[in-house]
């Protein structure tokens, strides 16, 4: 698919999918692709989409396990899917440049936004559905500051399976540097953990924040640098679906 400049589904495949939908029967779109594509039409018209990338010779067995409910899906996107090709390039860890519009907002005068779609992606980095549901609660940090030389913090949050199926959830830790000597991304993935939960079960998930998680590569110094200052620890089920944010300071 990387040989095509068009990121939407080819017309012949779209016509076939549209014809299947018009039968009135339930349809699941199994989407093979080696890169993010524009799936806005599919998202609006297809009841369910299973993105399988290029899974190899045994992918059919894995796909059947998911479709027939033998396995609860738990995958998360490792790339951002745009609403429109005109949004590209698009990354979850973008810089806070221009006059940015707050996440979830559609349009506001004198802000850096489009007039035909929101700034948000169709499917954000880290996104993924499950046959069950999860609740996050009680995010905490082990301290409100850490030492630059040898300190570290732990971020913890409680995850509960509020649905009816055994399932895995991937808890994601992002870091935001509030003010730096260079422009830093609005958030950067610095850790994640998969947790398996039975229906009604809850577990405390703990993730470590160390100096490396707060560092960036300084081109002038040719080394990794962690600058003292204020940060935010952000835990979510994706880069967009934030479940908790706690500030802390690097001293």
Label each PLM-derived region with a short phrase.
Residues 32-168, 174, 228, 232-236, ...:
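Secreted, periplasmic, or luminal enzymes acting at the cell surface/secretory milieu
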Residues 152-154, 202-206, 243-245:
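Intrinsic-disorder/low-complexity, polar/charged segments enriched in Ser/Thr/Lys/Arg/Asp/Glu/Gln
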Residues 1-45:
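Hydrophobic helix-and-loop "lid/oligomerization" segment in the mid-to-C-terminal part
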Residues 208-237:
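Short, surface-exposed ligand- or partner-binding patches at beta-edge/loop junctions that are enriched
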Residues 164-181, 187-189:
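Short acidic, flexible loop segments centered on an aromatic residue
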Residues 181-219:
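Intrinsically disordered, low-complexity Pro/Gly/Ser/Thr-rich segments with frequent PxxP/GP/PP motifs
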Residues 7, 11-19, 61, 65, ...:
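Feature representing long, continuous alpha-helical segments
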């Amino acid at each position: 698919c990387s040989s095509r400049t068009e990121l939407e589904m080819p017309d012949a495949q779209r016509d076939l999918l549209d014809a299947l939908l018009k039968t009135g029967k339930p349809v699941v779109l199994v989407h093979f692709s080696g890169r993010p594509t524009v799936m806005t039409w599919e998202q609006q018209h297809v009841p369910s989409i299973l993105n399988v990338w290029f899974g190899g010779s045994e992918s059919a067995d894995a796909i059947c396990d998911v479709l027939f409910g033998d396995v609860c899906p738990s995958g998360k996107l490792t790339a951002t899917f745009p609403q429109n090709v005109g949004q590209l390039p698009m990354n979850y860890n973008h810089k806070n440049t221009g006059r940015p519009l707050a996440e979830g907002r559609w349009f506001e005068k004198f802000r850096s936004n489009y007039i035909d779609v929101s700034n948000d992606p169709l499917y954000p980095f880290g996104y993924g559905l499950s046959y069950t549901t999860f609740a996050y609660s009680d995010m905490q940090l082990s301290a409100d500051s850490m030492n630059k030389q040898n300190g570290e913090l732990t971020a913890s949050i409680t995850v509960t399976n509020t649905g009816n199926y055994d399932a895995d959830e991937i808890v994601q830790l992002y870091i935001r540097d509030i003010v730096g000597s260079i422009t830093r991304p609005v958030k950067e993935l610095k850790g994640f953990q998969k947790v398996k939960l039975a229906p009604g079960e809850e577990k405390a998930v703990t993730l470590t924040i160390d100096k490396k998680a707060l560092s960036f590569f300084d081109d002038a110094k040719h080394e990794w640098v962690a600058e003292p200052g204020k940060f935010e620890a952000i835990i979510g089920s994706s880069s967009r679906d934030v479940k908790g944010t706690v500030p802390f300071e690097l001293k």
